[in-house]
Swiss-Prot record:
Organism the protein comes from: Clostridium pasteurianum
InterPro entries the record matches: Nase_Fe-Fe_AnfO
Pfam family, one: AnfO_nitrog
Highest taxon above the source species: Bacteria
Protein name: Uncharacterized protein in ferredoxin 2Fe-2S gene 3'region
Length: 141
């Protein structure tokens, strides 16, 4: 059976010289440790509750639906409001399953513009444009 088929099925394949009784316990510990590290890394990614910076300076992204699924007790307002009020940015892309009711008034109050694009049934992209930022502010943060 080809290596790739076994690997896709979740098998761990190792090659070693010697008596298996001498190294199997150590190999098992290494595999468990590796899986625990991967689980911690994934959990850390899932708990990020603020927009992440994109490659282009001043541009950010957040998948609001994913963040709220991973953090059920946190509202869209608690996630987005601190960022909108405190973080200098040019553009924020928000993917969500509905447009938060509070966001239009909040953005108007902050002097920001936005546009909404329907991606699929029940999925939207909201682009928020911060017109009151400048290059100096973006570079210094």
């Amino acid at each position: 059976i080809p290596y790739s088929v076994l690997k896709k099925s979740g098998f761990v394949i190792a090659e070693a010289d010697g008596n298996p009784e001498e190294f199997l316990d150590e190999l098992m510990e290494m595999i468990i440790e590796s899986k625990e590290k991967e689980a911690k890394r994934r959990k850390a990614q899932d708990t990020v509750i603020e927009p992440i910076a994109l490659e282009k300076q001043g541009e950010y992204f957040i998948n609001l639906e994913r963040v709220q699924n991973n953090n059920p007790g946190i509202s869209s307002k608690k996630i987005l409001q601190p960022f909108l009020k405190n973080k200098p940015f040019r553009e924020l892309k928000i993917v969500c399953n509905h447009i938060p009711k509070w966001i239009e008034n909040e953005l108007m109050t902050l002097g920001m513009k936005f546009e909404v694009k329907k991606l699929t049934e029940g999925e939207f992209e909201v682009k928020v444009y911060n017109q009151f930022n400048d290059e100096k502010t973006l570079v210094n943060r």
